[in-house]
């Protein structure tokens, strides 16, 4: 079957939730038995978000094949079973750099390179490539209609719709329908102007998703349909909800999936949302709660740890618990002391880069170890736990990471200079390597030690988890730390790189070099997070 396309755009304001809406629609279509993928097209000039500040852009989501991508791809994977790859996210920077590379190589035979057709052709080519083999491809365009940056992307999608045929394409536009308290009514004019903006570049939306803090009244939906040239049944009301996992059912209740299947002439089963109903039941009926302290350096923007936040919620679903996350700036631990860590049921230190706040994280790991507080360290969270143990248990005073102190006597964490990737190829890095795209990225095998807590949680000898880091445990100094009692319970496929450490004689202290949050989903959870939240609950009862 030829691929059908749903192009998702946004209007009026940003941050309306295009990614959540696209993922929710994909979840319904998948529940109807269709093979669905989702792509995100980002108009910014960065080649990828890998070197962007988390406080500006939010987290960098790492795919199975090692792409550093937009956090929306995390939403996609949490809503559907399809695994995202490098083909599912590209930026204007990536498009332009590829076109310029081809021009330098002589691929265009001396032609004058222009936005149309060369940039738009490259965009179309990547969309078609990413959609190949799927029944439905949902393509989300970042930004807001009217932005200069997004014009080449919208023009490319307009052309693609003409080329593949309008019977195989749907334009779905998210727009804001604000409620004005003084008038006591919702206002449709911003939506009308947003559609007018789309029409000015040759795109007639087929579906309007109207975001508001309440359901849009039928008379206002009819008004929007009339003035925006859209069937009334294709004007969908998407109100604010307490949980994003309610949205698939909300869209289905208004017949959005029926409209799309009829438009594409797809003969498929009714959507079975029983898995999502179970998720919502677990979420609405907790049997208790826990408070997890997340100690990091980007705590002013929770989206910087989006996948970790969601993974903790998923672990709450697994354990029928409400997980309350208390964000703690690691610099506050340095200045205010460890008292701010009291009354926490569990402590989590997520990944991060740079020296700022590191000593606060080391203090936090020490507090968790010495006070028997369940601890989960991720990436840098494992490295600070290793440094802390080396300093205070192994007696290696001044132990540190060469990332933070290149002249320290005991660089227990050091730059990876050579390792094997998933295909068995040797990757080499040095201090002179570029920051962008030079880390150990993507899914890597990890071999677990039998009898360890990690082995017990995973129930497997070999696991596969995603990585994003440059620094590793220094194998030259590692034996001294292990001799002091620290357990290395997970190793890379070649048995050279430390993947998991555990502190013995502690209720629950596990730290991993990889990022387990990237593979956690609301329907399946993740064994590490589930075990951590369970341990936190048991600690709360003491």
UniProtKB/Swiss-Prot annotation:
Allosterically activated by GTP, when glutamine is the substrate; GTP has no effect on the reaction when ammonia is the substrate. The allosteric effector GTP functions by stabilizing the protein conformation that binds the tetrahedral intermediate(s) formed during glutamine hydrolysis. Inhibited by the product CTP, via allosteric rather than competitive inhibition. Its EC number is 6.3.4.2. Catalyzes the ATP-dependent amination of UTP to CTP with either L-glutamine or ammonia as the source of nitrogen. Regulates intracellular CTP levels through interactions with the four ribonucleotide triphosphates. Keywords: ATP-binding, Glutamine amidotransferase, Ligase, Magnesium, Metal-binding, Nucleotide-binding, Pyrimidine biosynthesis. CTPSs have evolved a hybrid strategy for distinguishing between UTP and CTP. The overlapping regions of the product feedback inhibitory and substrate sites recognize a common feature in both compounds, the triphosphate moiety. To differentiate isosteric substrate and product pyrimidine rings, an additional pocket far from the expected kinase/ligase catalytic site, specifically recognizes the cytosine and ribose portions of the product inhibitor. Residues 1-266 are annotated as: Amidoligase domain. Pfam families: CTP_synth_N, GATase. The active site is at 379 (nucleophile), 515, 517. This is CTP synthase. CTP binds at residues 14, 147-149, 187-192, 223.
